[in-house]
Amino acid sequence: METIYDEIEIEDFTFDPVTQLFQYPCPCGDRFAVSIDDLNDGEDIAVCPSCSLMVKVIFEPEDLQEYYDEI
């Protein structure tokens, strides 16, 4: 079973249109990351690659369109 560290609103993530990743600072010093396509496919968990903590991304599917417009 997954253990979710926190729930974070999508507006609190930074979006990089080049990598198409949403990122958010992790307590370990690295960053949680999830791709816009994963979110669009219904995957709402961002994982830190360094410490494996996970956060749930809170968003509505229509929120993603403004980010797709940046790509």
From Swiss-Prot:
Question: Can you give the residue ranges of the DPH-type MB domain?
Answer: 4-60
Q: Does Nucleus count among this protein's keywords?
A: yes
What is its pathway? Protein modification; peptidyl-diphthamide biosynthesis
List this protein's GO terms for biological process.
Answer: protein histidyl modification to diphthamide; tRNA wobble base 5-methoxycarbonylmethyl-2-thiouridinylation
* Keyword field: Cytoplasm, Iron, Metal-binding, Nucleus, Oxidoreductase
Catalyzes what? [3Fe-4S](1+)-[protein] + Fe(2+)-[Dph3] = [3Fe-4S](0)-[protein] + Fe(3+)-[Dph3]; 2 [3Fe-4S](0)-[protein] + 2 Fe(2+)-[Dph3] + NADH = 2 [4Fe-4S](1+)-[protein] + 2 [Dph3] + NAD(+) + H(+)
Question: Which superkingdom, per the lineage?
Answer: Eukaryota
Tell me which cofactor or cofactors this protein depends on. Answer: Fe(2+)
Name the major location: cytoplasm
Which residues does Fe cation bind? C26, C28, C48, C51
The record's GO CC annotations read: cytoplasm; nucleus
Pfam families named among the record's database cross-references = Zn_ribbon_CSL (PF05207)
Q: Which Gene3D superfamilies match?
A: DPH Zinc finger
Q: Where in the cell is it found?
A: Cytoplasm; Nucleus
Q: Which InterPro entries match?
A: DPH3/4-like, DPH_MB_dom, DPH_MB_sf
Q: Does the keyword Metal-binding apply?
A: yes
Q: Name one GO molecular function term.
A: ferrous iron binding
Q: How does it assemble?
A: Component of the 2-(3-amino-3-carboxypropyl)histidine synthase complex composed of DPH1, DPH2, DPH3 and a NADH-dependent reductase, predominantly CBR1.
Q: What does this protein do?
A: Required for the first step of diphthamide biosynthesis, a post-translational modification of histidine which occurs in elongation factor 2. DPH1 and DPH2 transfer a 3-amino-3-carboxypropyl (ACP) group from S-adenosyl-L-methionine (SAM) to a histidine residue, the reaction is assisted by a reduction system comprising KTI11/DPH3 and a NADH-dependent reductase, predominantly CBR1. Acts as an electron donor to reduce the Fe-S cluster in DPH1-DPH2 keeping the [4Fe-4S] clusters in the active and reduced state.
Protein family membership: Belongs to the DPH3 family.
Q: Which PANTHER family match?
A: DIPHTHAMIDE BIOSYNTHESIS PROTEIN 3 (PTHR21454:SF31), DPH3 HOMOLOG-RELATED (PTHR21454)
For domains, the record's comment is: The DPH-type metal-binding (MB) domain can also bind zinc. However, iron is the physiological binding partner as zinc binding impairs the protein electron donor function.
Please give the name of this protein. Answer: Diphthamide biosynthesis protein 3
Name the species this protein comes from: Debaryomyces hansenii (strain ATCC 36239 / CBS 767 / BCRC 21394 / JCM 1990 / NBRC 0083 / IGC 2968)
